[in-house]
């Protein structure tokens, strides 16, 4: 049997911080809108909150005709589009969906729109396999599944992914297979806040991290299987078998997510948890805050950084709809408790060497669901959290980065000196992949 390949080497990442939490529109409207004061005391049109979710968010309910056909159409486009420009979010309203096999390709997010994963049930599967790459799953990147309950047709759901492909807030009423058909190589992976009633079978997976979840058993390990706060996890036994197990997760927070409250879209922002074990939703409604969509600037392709920054300064949160966003100035988030949530692997590219995102040394900013892709002009940094020498105590309400990914090259020439700099204290980094391309275009 061949040994699995070594995973791609990540770019240099400088994390300057005293304490890290555990873990790894387009144009402002000019008519009939409120006004705001500019820095020079002038009246400026305010950026409106709310609105529709744009063309790349596909919303389904149980009565939608030919759901399988639409899902298959998107998968056909995205199955092998590793460095493509399309982005998609498949959103399912609460209810029961029969005979669904949602195959998930690159830059595709599938999610339920309930407050609890059990609100949206598939009598079927959410599948990732590796047929496009001859059974090798080591390049199954950049996709996600969230907030659904699955009754797999065969009794076991297949989620054969590698990096940057989270499985969050999922309830699988059966088993979960993390390997591709044929047990080819795979280099995952991440599960959080999920309940797997049956066994999880990594099989050919090189490594995996599972956090604050519940499993009915764990079959094997190859290099390292890591668990924190997981009910049913195997006992700590590294290196043979290669299980690293913590009974609880010292500090964690679940990722914000979009949901429907009746007919109204809201974003739920979970509370910080201490010494967590098991899922956050076991008793029904999780602890946290619901924010109406009209308190968000719904960012769509074509939006510029100036408008995004104006929205934040005005007091709005940010919801990036699926798309690719080219910016010519830094997105600055200096207001405490701001949520910046991306759908469908929303991608930010700094075109002229600026830092893509800077977060101030403030409490409780939530960055989630974003891919920052280095541009052709070198950026000294791509993401910064807090200025140099930041020293404020944020332990009661830390900033968090969740499913925030960085890429340098692959989709084209990309240059950056340092990917992520964390200067603020107490920051929670919950699932990231910081990748300097070893294939594609513009790498090396």
Per-segment meaning from a language model:
Residues 42-444:
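Extracellular/periplasmic carbohydrate-active domains that bind, remodel
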Residues 31-46:
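C-terminal region of N-terminal signal peptides and the immediate post-cleavage residues
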Residues 21-34:
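Bacterial N-terminal signal peptides
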Residues 6, 30, 36, 70, ...:
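Compositionally biased, intrinsically disordered low-complexity segments
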Residues 12, 16-21, 187:
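Generic alpha-helix initiation/capping and coil-helix boundary signal
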Residues 1-16:
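N-terminal secretory signal peptides that target proteins for export/translocation
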